[in-house]
Amino acid sequence: MTDNQYATEELNQLQKELVAKNPIDVLQFCANYFNSKLELQRSQLWQQQNKAKAAGINLFPSIDNVFNSDGGAIMTTNKRQPSFKSPFGDNDPTSIDHHHDDDPKEAPGASKQQNKAELFKGGFGVGKSTPSKPLQELDPNDPSHSASQDTDAAPPVPKSKIPVAFNANRRTSVSAEAMNPNKFKSDSWKPPINDLTAAQKVELSKTLGSNFLFRQLDVSSKKTVIEALGKKEFKNGDEIIKQGDEGDYFYIIEKGTVDFYVNGNQVNSSGEGSSFGELALMYNSPRAATAVAASDTGVTCWALDRQTFRRILLERTFNRRLMYEDFLKDVKVLSSLSSQERSKLADALSTEIYHKGDKIVKEGEQGENFYFIESGSCQVSKDGKGVLTKLSKGDYFGEVALLNDLPRQATVEALDTVIVATLGKSGFSRLLGPAVDILKSQDPTANQGSSN
């Protein structure tokens, strides 16, 4: 399988996962997806380490064994955690420099012979056109490796710069370009504003509402996206995007049909209201397919530029995380969560607004969400028992139906304008962690005093 085919297969699989899971935080979901794929691949390679060594193949070019001062006993500090050659180490300012100032530039007597059958090489040095050299391994039979009798001298260890949280020895995959959300409020960036009719804005709003990337945008962000969309016309047979090119626009089809080709073979077609081109913008990866206008009368698309696309999605995610992290700190039932767990929970929450008299949950209905009250007040009532209690900011409801897979045990009604943060059933047990046990211990079902 070629690199392009491999990338296309990975991106197609990711697209299926995105459609199936419909995550609130798309960026976090995709990062977790590729991290889990990497972890699985590395685990499989590690299991083949002994067989590979027997065949003369070095899956992990590294220095696994460093001899102690006796020259015979092997130090096992890195035996299970081999030191990997970083493809970015020479130019990465975040690298950790694993050497002492008085270390020699090279390990004395280090073998000059390169591995003959390396599967993975660090040849992606940033800012360089020449591949970086693989790590040299110490020759255990070389007497020059014996440490000096001087106890002040440290054993010779080659320099190895490893970026923080770097996973080495695999092909590089998609990666998002660096953007710092903290600078958003201080820079001078302004989104483009195009002259659209009221009818066009309404139609585009409907289209964005059905797209998983923009579904959770607030009113202001959605307005910015709509006004930034520019109309582009293509004749029959025109290439809208080309496989392997850098992504510059995200497209929504207004009129006509677009055919998609991978390595010259047609793989799909899309019509009015469909969108394409988002993955290359999100992850700074090459276009996975070629899109060709396939209507005799031409194709009309709405296009969103790369910077606005990434800026809106990233800024929104960043601001939501900050807002929800502050809010979740004040929710007592979540006090057992770590800051990292709260951050993950914050990314999964979505906001819903209800007005006075609205029924947020109804007794007898199937429960699908767990709710935290951000602002406003609600009353909890049950058939035959009337109003049971009132809830306000920081209170929660909806847990009983999810904990016990039961219908809603009560009705929750908004007493004024209420803003709630919601968490779906799939994320309830996955993200609440130890808080689930606390919720179970407080389950009011047995006492018939349930609030949901």
From Swiss-Prot:
The keyword Phosphoprotein applies. 3',5'-cyclic AMP 2 binds at residues 399, 408. The modification Phosphoserine is found at residue 173. Residues 28-212 are annotated as: Dimerization and phosphorylation. 3',5'-cyclic AMP 1 binds at residues 278, 287. InterPro entries: cAMP-dep_PK_reg_su-like, cAMP_dep_PK_reg_su, cAMP_dep_PK_reg_su_I/II_a/b, cNMP-bd_CS, cNMP-bd_dom, cNMP-bd_dom_sf, RmlC-like_jellyroll. A nucleoside 3',5'-cyclic phosphate 1 binds at residues 213-330. Residues 95-106 have a biased composition (Basic and acidic residues). Gene3D superfamilies: Jelly Rolls. GO terms for biological process: adenylate cyclase-activating G protein-coupled receptor signaling pathway; cellular response to glucose starvation; cellular response to nitrogen starvation; negative regulation of Ras protein signal transduction; positive regulation of protein export from nucleus; positive regulation of transcription by RNA polymerase II; protein localization to bud neck; regulation of cytoplasmic mRNA processing body assembly. Tetramer, composed of 2 regulatory (R) and 2 catalytic (C) subunits. In the presence of cAMP it dissociates into 2 active monomeric C subunits and an R dimer. Belongs to the cAMP-dependent kinase regulatory chain family. This is cAMP-dependent protein kinase regulatory subunit. It comes from Debaryomyces hansenii (strain ATCC 36239 / CBS 767 / BCRC 21394 / JCM 1990 / NBRC 0083 / IGC 2968) (Yeast). The gene is PKAR.
